[in-house]
């Protein structure tokens, strides 16, 4: 077993400074009142955070390593837990600060990672000149945000112009994995105009386009607390999955014959989702509108 503590800065020393920039395009004023000339001024280009500090990770583990059957099998098992405090993230600034300042990195969350890692190695001979080595690896992982800064219910990352209905696809909230996907649940496609007319009001609804679930009025377990409001808006967004895999594993096979060897490797990742941003441009309204009428 073991215990250890590590720090991670993840930010440059410049993060503490508030910066100002000048430019006629962003800050100007006709100070002489002639309406024919403009004086260049300064504007805040980045908000500083002098209170930012290193992330701190505390890891504990226990495990064993065993050789079996005269060394033919090597088994390694490890159980571990990693608590990370003062996670550094760049979060949007309040609108009262304007649209120009870049956000600083701030310490905003604590996260838990825990899991089990297993490795089994089998070595043997196929003949006098041939031998093999087979390695199986597997890792089970649980990831969860356990706390946020006071006054913060959640924070989102990702830019609005690259996701469904111009809203962030990623939300970080207590009880969910880091960078969990958050958006609208797709029920299918509108087959015809009759389905569009019968469905809740939805921006850009039309035959051949995605149909979203009206889940407003339901709790996280999808129990109905009150009737749906009959429209698709931000209150219908929900958690769609995690980018963090629940299991990762692999198989490695190496065969040696004399002075030649052949090696192959298979890897798998299970239990996680991926966000295919190219689909935003090809499948989703409003970046993709499709044909309004059939030919």
Q: Each PLM stretch: what is its role?
A:
Residues 133, 242-270:
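Conserved C-terminal beta-signal and adjacent last beta-strands/turns
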Residues 13-18, 27, 123-241, 279-295:
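Conserved small-residue
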Residues 1-174:
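Extracellular/periplasmic, surface-exposed regions of secreted and cell-surface proteins
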Residues 145-146, 271-275:
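Short acidic/glycine-rich loop or secondary-structure boundary segments that cap or lie
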Residues 80-85, 94-96, 268-272, 279-285:
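Active/binding-pocket-proximal capping segment
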Residues 10-11, 182, 263-265, 272-274:
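Short helix/loop capping segments that flank catalytic or ligand/cofactor-binding pockets
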Residues 44-47, 234, 246:
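Flexible glycine/proline-enriched surface loops and loop-helix/loop-strand junctions
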